[in-house]
């Protein structure tokens, strides 16, 4: 039984060694490649576009900041940190004069014009970006 798989593995090698096998395979692979690449490109773009348009963000409260019941949110890649701050302030019904700080992975505060997609690419893990929010300065 061990000889049969070896001979099966050797057959493609011997076919590849012969020029006829490569010529026969080339038209067959050439014909499926354009449709598959055309099918893969839109297929890849559509799911990648869906997943890349929306990023999962896990929002965690720090200190005396009110805790959001919904912690996991799907946010567009192009949304800025300032947009998130405004959203969280409205969601928590904070006064406009109250400050809200956002930290990435409990380490640094990104700039308000930073896009969420860029932060996700650099600091995302397990398919999500963890952001901590608080009313007083905590880290960095």
Swiss-Prot record:
The compartments listed are: Cytoplasm; Preautophagosomal structure membrane
Q: Composition bias, kind Low complexity: at what positions?
A: 25-42
> What modifications does the entry list under PTM / processing?
Acetylated by EP300.
Cellular component GO terms, alphabetically?
Atg12-Atg5-Atg16 complex; autophagosome; autophagosome membrane; cytosol; intracellular membrane-bounded organelle; nucleoplasm; phagocytic vesicle membrane; phagophore assembly site membrane
Q: Glycyl lysine isopeptide (Gly-Lys) (interchain with K-130 in ATG5) cross-link position in this chain?
A: 140
Q: Its topology with respect to the membrane?
A: Peripheral membrane protein
Q: At the top level of its lineage, which domain of life is listed?
A: Eukaryota
Mention one GO molecular function.
Answer: protein tag activity
Principal location class: cytoplasm
**What effect on the protein does mutating residue 63 to D have, as reported in its record?**
Impairs E3 activity of the ATG12-ATG5 conjugate
* CDD domains reported in the protein's UniProt record: Ubl_ATG12 (cd01612)
Per the UniProt entry, the effect of residue 113 to V is: Impairs E3 activity of the ATG12-ATG5 conjugate
Q: What induces it?
A: Expression is induced by mitochondrial DNA deletions, chloramphenicol and nicotinamide.
* UniProt region (Disordered), positions on chain: 1-50
Q: What is the effect of changing residue 72 to D?
A: Impairs E3 activity of the ATG12-ATG5 conjugate
Instruction: Return the Pfam families for the record.
Output: APG12
Q: Which UniProt keywords apply?
A: Acetylation, Autophagy, Cytoplasm, Host-virus interaction, Isopeptide bond, Membrane, Ubl conjugation pathway
In the UniProt entry, what is the domain comment?
Answer: Shares weak sequence similarity with ubiquitin family, but contains an 'ubiquitin superfold' and the C-terminal Gly is required for isopeptide linkage.
Quaternary context: Forms a conjugate with ATG5. Part of the minor complex composed of 4 sets of ATG12-ATG5 and ATG16L1 (400 kDa); this complex interacts with ATG3 leading to disruption of ATG7 interaction and promotion of ATG8-like proteins lipidation. Forms an 800-kDa complex composed of ATG12-ATG5 and ATG16L2. Interacts with DHX58/RIG-1, IFIH1/MDA5 and MAVS/IPS-1 in monomeric form as well as in ATG12-ATG5 conjugate. The interaction with MAVS is further enhanced upon vesicular stomatitis virus (VSV) infection.
Protein family: Belongs to the ATG12 family.
Cited function: Ubiquitin-like protein involved in autophagy vesicles formation. Conjugation with ATG5 through a ubiquitin-like conjugating system involving also ATG7 as an E1-like activating enzyme and ATG10 as an E2-like conjugating enzyme, is essential for its function. The ATG12-ATG5 conjugate acts as an E3-like enzyme which is required for lipidation of ATG8 family proteins and their association to the vesicle membranes. (Microbial infection) May act as a proviral factor. In association with ATG5, negatively regulates the innate antiviral immune response by impairing the type I IFN production pathway upon vesicular stomatitis virus (VSV) infection. Required for the translation of incoming hepatitis C virus (HCV) RNA and, thereby, for the initiation of HCV replication, but not required once infection is established.
Q: What else is known?
A: Small amount of ATG5-ATG12 conjugate is enough to perform normal autophagy.
UniProt-recorded name of the protein: Ubiquitin-like protein ATG12
What organism does this protein naturally occur in?
Answer: Homo sapiens
Task: Please name the gene that encodes this protein.
Answer: ATG12
């Amino acid at each position: 039984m061990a000889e049969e798989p070896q001979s099966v593995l050797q057959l493609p090698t011997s076919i590849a060694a012969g020029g006829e096998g490569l010529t026969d395979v080339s038209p067959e692979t050439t014909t499926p490649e354009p449709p598959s690449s055309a099918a893969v490109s839109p297929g890849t773009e559509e799911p990648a576009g869906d997943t890349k348009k929306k990023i999962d963000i896990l929002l965690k409260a720090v200190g005396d900041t009110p805790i959001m019941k919904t912690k996991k949110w799907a946010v567009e890649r192009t949304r800025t940190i300032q947009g998130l701050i405004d959203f969280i302030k409205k969601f928590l019904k904070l006064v406009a004069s109250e400050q809200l700080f956002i930290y990435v992975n409990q380490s640094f505060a990104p700039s308000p014009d930073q896009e969420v997609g860029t932060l996700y690419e650099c600091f995302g893990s397990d398919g999500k970006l963890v952001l901590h929010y608080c009313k007083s300065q905590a880290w960095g």
